[in-house]
């Protein structure tokens, strides 16, 4: 209710009316849909499945007809003939591959058995057997590869067979096991692979002065005695390589890269450049492989067998004096090292180099695993242990004879350093 007073004193009153709408509810009453019975649902399901099966059969018949058309086409017939020809040729090739791998496996087994048949090999304890474990594993691996080649898809599917054979061959391509040479080779005898590559002097590219062998060591001696890096190399290189610590092994890859900044890599580059002036086809990795398979085995085996003639062929006067003195002293006392056996040669690396007045000098380091035994005339062990292999770290100084243009004959041992350490198992 609202009110107000007018000017004449009369009060006017107005009342506001409010209406409340009423809520009307409608309810729909209808009959529920009748429920389908079990039998009706079953009939509908059977009808749907029959319809789907009919469509499936139609699609299957269409696919069969299409495959029949493709199978009878001339293009597919020609492709099938070519496939059969390739498959036959691949089977022939796989047989050859399998045969070659089996031959390699037999060769490696014979090498291991040769060591085991020796007197030192028969007396080997668990420590000695462990030293040959890697050799046996390599032989067993090759044998398994041969079996895998026979069982792979070579005999079933050409596309997969060719890849399988390639992968298996790649896996064993880098297997290098030391094989003891039956007959030693002098440096002057040369090697077949290198005799074909005779290099002639390049007078316009090099000004290297030619000198006699007697001047070789005098120049090297002056350098080695005054060079502190060389002395440090002899010390830390041996200690670093002989470490079996996990952290040290992980760091080797890093230090090899960083070391090139602080070590004599610049001098090595200079030496390699000068070598290329004499031998344009010189390759560092090929040369290290030549050292591993030719130079090192012949010198070490000649030292073990007391073959002074072969030693003298490979060594300059200084290195020959070092090695021959030991041999001659042993011969005077009727000592023998014939039961010593080299098991493996590895980690052949180029440590540094130096360009001397007489020519290029390269220093290599490597490790030798061997049974190192010295016996007297009565067959008793006077030095070494036939039951425990040793790891011997080597640092060799090799010089190139610039008067010799045949690379197979040009390299001689100038100086040798050895340090024997027990094999850590």
From Swiss-Prot:
It comes from the Eukaryota. Belongs to the Tim44 family. The keyword Coiled coil applies. Keywords: Coiled coil, Membrane, Mitochondrion, Mitochondrion inner membrane, Protein transport, Transit peptide, Translocation, Transport. Probable component of the PAM complex at least composed of a mitochondrial HSP70 protein, GrpE, tin-44, tim-16 and tim-14/dnj-21. The complex interacts with the tim-23 component of the TIM23 complex. This is Probable mitochondrial import inner membrane translocase subunit tin-44. GO terms for cellular component: mitochondrial inner membrane. The gene is tin-44.
């Amino acid at each position: 209710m609202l009110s107000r007073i007018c000017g004449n004193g009369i009060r006017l009153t107005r009342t506001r009316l409010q209406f409340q709408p009423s809520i009307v509810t409608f309810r729909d009453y209808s009959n529920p849909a009748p429920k389908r019975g079990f039998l009706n649902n079953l009939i509908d399901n059977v009808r749907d499945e029959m319809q789907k099966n009919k469509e499936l059969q139609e699609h299957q018949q269409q696919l069969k007809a299409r495959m029949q058309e493709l199978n009878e086409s001339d293009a597919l017939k020609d492709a099938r003939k070519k496939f059969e020809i390739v498959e036959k040729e691949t089977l022939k090739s796989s047989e050859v591959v399998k045969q070659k791998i089996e031959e390699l496996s037999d060769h490696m087994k014979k090498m291991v058995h040769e060591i085991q048949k020796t007197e030192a090999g028969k007396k080997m304890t668990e420590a000695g057997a462990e030293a040959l474990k890697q050799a046996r594993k390599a032989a067993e691996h090759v044998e398994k590869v041969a079996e895998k080649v026979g069982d792979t898809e070579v005999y079933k599917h050409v596309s997969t067979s060719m890849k399988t054979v390639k992968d298996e061959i790649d896996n064993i391509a880098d297997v290098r096991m030391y094989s003891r040479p039956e007959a030693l080779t002098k440096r002057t005898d040369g090697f077949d692979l290198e005799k074909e590559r005779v290099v002639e002097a390049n007078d316009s590219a090099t000004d290297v002065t030619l000198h006699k062998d007697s001047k070789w060591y005098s120049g090297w001696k002056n350098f080695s005695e005054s060079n502190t890096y060389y002395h440090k190399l002899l010390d830390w290189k041996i200690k670093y390589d002989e470490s079996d610590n996990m952290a040290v092994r992980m760091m080797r890859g890093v230090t090899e890269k960083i070391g090139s900044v602080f070590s004599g890599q610049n001098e090595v580059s200079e030496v390699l450049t000068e070598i290329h002036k004499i031998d344009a086809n010189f390759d560092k990795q090929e040369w290290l492989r030549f050292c591993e398979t030719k130079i090192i085995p012949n010198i070490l085996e000649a030292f073990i067998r007391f073959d002074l003639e072969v030693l003298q062929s490979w060594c300059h006067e200084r290195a020959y004096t070092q090695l021959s003195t030991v041999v001659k002293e042993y011969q005077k006392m009727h000592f023998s090292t014939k039961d010593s056996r080299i098991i493996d040669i590895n980690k052949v690396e180029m440590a540094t180099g130096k360009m001397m007045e007489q020519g290029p000098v390269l220093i290599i380091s490597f490790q030798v695993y061997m049974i190192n035994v010295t016996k007297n005339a009565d067959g008793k062990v006077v030095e070494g242990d036939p039951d425990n292999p040793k790891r011997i770290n080597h640092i060799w100084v090799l010089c190139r004879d610039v008067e010799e243009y045949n690379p197979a004959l040009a390299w001689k041992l100038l100086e040798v350093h050895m340090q024997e350490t027990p094999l850590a198992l």
